[in-house]
Amino acid sequence: MHPKLLARPAILTKSVVVVALVIGFGLQACDAGTFPAANSREIKAIRSQIRASQFLSKATFGPTQETIDSLAGRINQIGYRRACEEWIDEQFALPMTSQEQVARDIIAADGREPDTQGVGASLYRYQAWWHIALTSEDQLRQKVAWALSQIFVISDSGAAFNNDDKRAIGNGEFTITDWLGMSTFYDMLARHASGNYRELLSDVTWHPNMGVYLSAWRNRKSNIPAGRYPDENYAREIMQLFSIGLYQMHQDGRLKRNALGELIPTYDNEGIKELARVFTGFRTHHNTSSSFFTNYNFGSPMQMYAQEHDNNLNYAEDPNNPGQVDPSAPQSKTLFGVTLSPLPTPLTNEAATAEVEEALDVIASQDNVPPFICRLLIQRLVKSNPSRAYMRRVTRKFRDNGHGVRGDMNAVIKAILLDPEVVRGQRLMRRTNPLRVEVVTRGTEHSRLREPIQRITSWIRAMRPTSNYYTSDPRTGKPFMMLSHSIQGDIDQMPYRAPSVFNYYLPDYQPPGDLVGHPPSSRIPREGLFAPEFQVLTAVSANRTINRFSYIARVRYIQYGMRKNSCRISFNLDEELELAKDNANLPEILRRFDLWLCSGSLSEQTKTSIINAITSESTSASQNVLRLEEALAAVILSPDCAIEE
């Protein structure tokens, strides 16, 4: 079964491409397309290029001809798996590109101090993200950080996250301006892209942006006479979204059931209450203040304030007899059957901090963590419906990287990207008479809808882009290459702007239509098939995307206003413009666009429709610009390009 945005035949006029998109589902694998070859050596080269493009479309923000050629060359030399593993090692060895630093660089290049207040500086946060996604060398780290940001979600709707304020924290020091806090959170995710899950969970918990977003900041211990109890928000979400999910899972992704056939919850309301007691006493970092109610400081991890941390006595003290303890009241905290260590009296900051870390140890050790987290990572990086075998192989690496280490993110990312299932969405068949590589797609269980941001970044990166921005990145000397937050109005997705802690879309979302109720094969661990990215594809958003994409293809640039001036990113397609002078070169142009944008999945039917439509409208060499623009628009709007195999 194959979810496709079924495209009616394109109608091409002199400057307009109209493609009507209808959400639909086919029920079988289909021929994606063919790549002609002159000899066996070309067959090998073509296969390597397609495999390289397919891998890079998942591991980066989009392949380029240069990155395809580089990886394909190594595939020819040492084989697919070794070449890709080598590439991963090289990527994680690169210095991390910092969102915070790039944002500071852009605002400084614009002639302002990074800590200047009152200039709407939060807009630079988005500009920095796009510049890094489009140009950074450490593509894999940034792509994994993007995936992690959709699991450990914060959003700019958080209180003060867009403020231009900074404040003194004693000893002559000041906080960073509030708007940079989200950039530091994203950098933290990027650092842990090749780190350890348990350490990531700790840094997420102590980060002030997460503390503010999910109410752990200033969360106070209970006061029974006053009717006050700890806020349960972070306790609930760290379990539901950041670690174990709602229901118990087998390591191959299947949901466990009890004797009555019912799903087995991973936690209950009492578990939330118990864990909420742990996440008390958090305040923002201050050098000298003794107050629990210190103001925002998004540049340093939160601190523990022991006086407001649940000390296992505040539930037991008799309010009518201070100091008298009810012996039947709980004297400890128990999580998942594990009783946390006793707390000293008086309680110290160090002991309260240690209790938080002990609780995180308990959470991270749960059996549900590997399948829950690995499934989300696979969905964000590779495919919507990983098989049971795929899940088993990846969760095995999560549990033990081969050296006795649990939660090694480097090993997990390798297991995800090097798994044979990554390339099983396409079969590359050698055919003769004539000699060619025929690409056959396997259908829904091996695919996913490309999310809007990936469609934009992949498109731009493939077009040999140049920027006309008036200032340059000090690391490269090249102009900053940026989009702005305004693009959200065109594609319904924007970094740092998830509508809620549940991300842009749910992992178990099923779009209306044939997919609902369609039984998957036995290789799939769930009873249904899911397509998360379809949740942001509505009739309205699809229409906006068509209009915007067709316009970009027609003008061959993308431009948005920045905080200062505007940035135009131009497509360098001079080679293809020269080819487009002759209609006979249209197959070669489509071959290039197919490799760059579709990883070889552009069907022969789509190619034929595009060629027929273009040749019926234009024949002279002077119409080469029109031909190229129409070909580009038709490819980028095709269902073959929208669906990643």
Predicted regions and their residues:
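N-terminal secretory signal peptides that target proteins for export/translocation
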Residues: 1-11
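Bacterial N-terminal signal peptides
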Residues: 15-28
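Bacterial Sec-dependent N-terminal signal peptides
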Residues: 25-45
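Flexible, low-complexity segments enriched for small/polar residues
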Residues: 45-46, 53-60, 76-77, 113, ...
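Cell-wall polysaccharide-cleaving catalytic domain and substrate-binding groove, primarily
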Residues: 46-98, 208-209, 216-223, 240, ...
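N-terminal accessory alpha/beta regions
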Residues: 63-192, 290, 296-297, 304-306
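Substrate-binding/catalytic groove segments of enzymes
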Residues: 66, 158, 246-252, 286, ...
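Active-site substrate-binding loop specific to GH73 endo-beta-N-acetylglucosaminidase modules
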Residues: 122-129, 162-415, 419-472, 642-645
